[in-house]
Amino acid sequence: MMHIPNRSIQAANIFFSSGAILLLIVGLIMEDWVELIPKVRKDKTTHSPWLGCCPPFWPEESLEVVRRIMRMTLNISIYLNLIIGLQFSYMISQNKCVHLLVGFLSFFAGCLLFYAIIVYHHKLNKGQYVYFVNYKTKWIAFTVYLTIALFLTCGIFCFIQSTNRCECMKFCIPHTESKSQEMIPSTIEVVSLPPRCAMPRSIVHVHSVTSKDGSLNRPHTQARRVTWAL
């Protein structure tokens, strides 16, 4: 089974959280989320849930909840990106609790943003029959769903990292290191020592002295001559 290294997961989380912040900032700058057509005048008016004021024909208090949730989501995403960056640079610990915290914040931010966009569409449908005739959704409104997907993906990766942290550290070994470890046993060779040379046989010549009466006289000290047979 193949496991993703921790550094790759953290790099992907930084990319996803940074992309979510970028999309939220783009949605904050762009003001034409929807195009409203009022009943009295036929002039088209653009609107965004980030705006601090609503059109004169649409009461402001009806969208205050949506605006607060969107701001809360932006703040959470900034803190989330900061925590992931500190974790990637080893400035905070990389234990299981930190991974679970980052995953919870990612899911919480995604759920908050999803709730905000659902409430905003509900307010649009409700105001269509009271304050304006029709509305048309622009392309910038669909970036919210991409932001939600980025938050959820970041949370899933954090939970995977918290559950498979030990397995990743155990099995995800670099290719060069594993190859060198496999080659170590094969390089060991048993070198046998040459057989111990046997000592050459020696031929000992004992010189005896013959006495005058013909008997062999073996003195106490005998003279010996050693000849090595090679």
UniProtKB/Swiss-Prot annotation:
InterPro entries: TMEM225. Expressed in testis, epididymis and spermatozoa (at protein level). Not expressed in brain, heart, lung, liver, spleen, kidney and skeletal muscle. It is a multi-pass membrane protein. A motif (RVxF) lies at residues 224-228. The chain crosses the membrane at residues 9-29, 72-92, 100-120, 140-160. One of its GO terms (cellular component) is outer acrosomal membrane. It is found in: Cytoplasmic vesicle, Secretory vesicle, Acrosome membrane. Residues 30-71, 121-139 are extracellular. It holds the Pfam family TM225. Residues 1-8, 93-99, 161-230 are cytoplasmic. The keyword Membrane applies. Keywords: Cytoplasmic vesicle, Membrane, Transmembrane, Transmembrane helix. One of its GO terms (molecular function) is protein phosphatase 1 binding. Probably inhibits protein phosphatase 1 (PP1) in sperm via binding to catalytic subunit PPP1CC. Interacts (via RVxF motif) with PPP1CC. PANTHER family: TRANSMEMBRANE PROTEIN 225. This is Transmembrane protein 225. It comes from Mus musculus (Mouse).
